[in-house]
């Protein structure tokens, strides 16, 4: 199946180091798990504005490995989900080897270089976006296949957005998600409308596959972050705008508990992945090969 190669989805790519005040991060504690090869995550956006990226997980288990996935609000009527992997080295580049017919891909540059995929995805406020990524050894030898899936709530099925095959270059870290830094972030990548409220909650589970996924319950953060609705949250915007959003959702979510620089919050509840989700993740669809 041929895949259309098009221009980038307009995301401003972040490294794990915060580059501007337009981004806030959660820094997850993997609880000693250094070799996770699967991650399941949930993102729920409660207030948004065009030009905002909500990264579910940005992983960097060690040099030179790294990648990220999440959802983005591009334009007033356009949203998407994004999955990308950085180059192993200047000579070893990831390649898309399988993808859904609606997936678009290209090379990216700027803050590092690598392989990028995205798919238009009309996610809604207050609706939880679910994603799953898994790493497996590739048949091609010293490579790792990284598969990314998103749950389509209307059709009630998982979609295989893409598989990106990454050269290991002799580095064990390429095969894992954990073992180094793992972050979620919220970024106003246009730098515009800074007083407009943006709010999202996040949860992550890691393991070696669907049946071994364990919740991550501890996180620190920077910017405006804390706990809300038994999840971690990130927020950006003017004080009055954010206050109005917190009040709007208080009946459903409760009141936020704010973190701060160097401040530790109690762990969130160690909720297991729903049994129906675990079952579905054991029988995922396969997208067509990219020629």
Model-derived features with residue positions:
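N-terminal secretory signal peptides that target proteins for export/translocation
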Residues: 1-3
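Bacterial N-terminal signal peptides
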Residues: 7-17
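Secretory/extracellular carbohydrate-interaction modules
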Residues: 23-105, 118, 255, 259-264, ...
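Short, aromatic/His-centered strand-loop micro-motif at the edge of beta-sheets
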Residues: 106-130
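Carbohydrate-binding surfaces in secreted/extracellular proteins
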Residues: 123-160
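Local beta-strand/beta-hairpin segments that build beta-sheet-rich folds
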Residues: 155-169, 216
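Flexible glycan-contacting loops in extracellular carbohydrate-active proteins
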Residues: 166-194
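Extended effector regions of multi-domain proteins
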Residues: 211-291
């Amino acid at each position: 199946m041929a895949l259309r190669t098009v221009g980038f989805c307009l995301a401003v790519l972040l490294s794990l180091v915060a580059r501007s005040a337009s981004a806030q991060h959660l820094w997850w504690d993997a609880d000693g798990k250094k070799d996770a090869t699967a991650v399941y995550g949930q993102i729920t956006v409660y207030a948004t504005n065009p030009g905002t990226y909500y990264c579910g997980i940005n992983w960097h288990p060690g040099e030179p490995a790294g990648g990220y996935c999440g959802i983005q609000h591009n334009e007033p009527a356009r949203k998407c989900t994004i999955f990308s992997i950085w180059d192993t080295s200047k000579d070893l580049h990831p390649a898309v080897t399988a993808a859904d017919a609606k997936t678009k891909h290209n090379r990216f540059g700027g803050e590092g270089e690598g392989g990028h995929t995205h798919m238009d995805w009309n996610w809604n406020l207050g609706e939880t976006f679910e994603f799953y990524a898994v790493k497996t050894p590739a048949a091609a030898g010293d490579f790792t296949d990284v598969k990314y899936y998103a749950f389509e709530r209307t059709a009630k099925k998982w979609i295989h957005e893409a598989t990106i095959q990454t050269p290991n270059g002799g580095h064990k870290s390429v095969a894992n998600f954990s073992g180094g830094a793992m972050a979620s972030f919220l970024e106003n990548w246009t730098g515009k409308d800074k007083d407009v409220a943006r709010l999202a909650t996040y949860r992550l589970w890691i393991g070696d596959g669907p049946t071994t996924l364990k919740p991550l319950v501890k996180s620190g953060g920077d910017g405006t972050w804390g706990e809300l609705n038994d999840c971690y949250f990130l927020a950006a915007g003017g004080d009055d705008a954010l206050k109005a959003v917190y009040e709007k959702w208080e009946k459903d979510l409760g009141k936020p508990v704010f973190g701060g620089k160097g401040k530790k919050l109690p762990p969130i509840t160690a909720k297991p992945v729903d049994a129906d989700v675990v079952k579905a993740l054991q029988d995922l669809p396969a997208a067509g090969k990219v020629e």
